[in-house]
Structures are given as C-alpha cells and as structure tokens.
Amino acid sequence: MAEGTRVAQDFGADIIDINMGCPARQVTGGLSGSALMRDLDHAMTLIEATVKAAAVPVTLKMRLGWDHGTLNAPELARRAEAAGVRMITVHGRTRCQFYGGRADWSAIARVREAITVPLIANGDGVSAADARAMLAASGADGIMLGRGAYGRPWWPGVIANLLDPGSGIMEPTLAEE
C-alpha cells in the first residue's frame, strides 16, 4: 500500500482513496475490498502504511461490515480517523448483502457518532428524495453517487442543486432526457 501510494502521488494524485467497500468475490477472495472488514487489525496495518507514505489526504470507503453479525464500521472508522484518515465513505450494506435489499442509512449514523472527520453516505441514492432522506437518516456531510448515476450524467448536478440550491442543475424532464 505504501509503494502504491508513492506511485500514485508521483503521477499527481490529489488524494489516496482506500476502497474497502468492494464486495466482488474476485476481490474479497484475496483479502481485499470488503473482506478487510473481517480483520480490522490487518485493515489498520494497510491504512497506517498508506497514511504514513502519503503527502496528500487519505480517504477510506467501506461497508457496514462483512455481514449482519459483524457491523464493525463504527470501530474501523474511529480507528482510521485516529490513524490520520481525513474522510470516510460508508456504503449502507454489508458485504454479504452485495447490492440486494435496501441500504441502511440509519446504520451509517452510528459511524457519524464515532468520528469527527467528514462522512459520506453511499447506497440507494437514486432520486432527489432518496438523497434528502439519506442525508437526514445518516447525519452524513454528503453523499457518494454510484449505480444511481448510471445513464444519468446530470445526476451529480441535480444533487449539487439539492444541497446548495442554485449551484447545480434541475432534474431534466422526460423529454429532455
């Protein structure tokens, strides 16, 4: 991780984002992505090495935990912040949920209670109403768009307008789409 951090910085990276949220089997099978939610000590070794090697801010993306029996995102977030991570994004599902069911935005709020750095909520932000509800339920400082933006390149502008009226764009009508 330290070497990758140095290489990324040499190529001009403005931040280093550690992705511990990927649920794909080909990623988690090698103790990467959200599989790191099963071994927080190992995850912290990687986070600490990255922060130590970084001259730019380090951010972290994770899920709520591996499964509903290990909802350890608040603990990992607290430890990551103490190690120097500057922003944390939480996807409101466990790894075992993949993308099924609904994201649990209120569970993201438990991470908000554990940290002081900016918190970004992720998962099921597919409408302006969802974005408002996600922010309200999670207490997050912002949202990260994912699958909800597929095929809708204007979606970030709509969310910007929602958060700061007049700064973004309005959602296009069906005719405009």
Enumerate the predicted regions with their spans.
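Alpha/beta catalytic cores of nucleotide-metabolism and tRNA/nucleoside-modifying enzymes
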Residues: 45, 53-55, 69-87, 99, ...
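Active-site beta-loop-alpha junctions enriched in small/polar residues
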Residues: 21-23, 61-67, 93-95, 122-126, ...
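Glycine-rich tight-turn/loop motif centered on a GG-T
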Residues: 25-42, 93-104, 163-168
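Short, functionally important structural connectors and interaction interfaces within domains
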Residues: 12, 28-29, 91, 95, ...
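Surface-exposed beta-strand edges and their flanking turn/coil or helix-capping segments
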Residues: 4-6, 103, 134
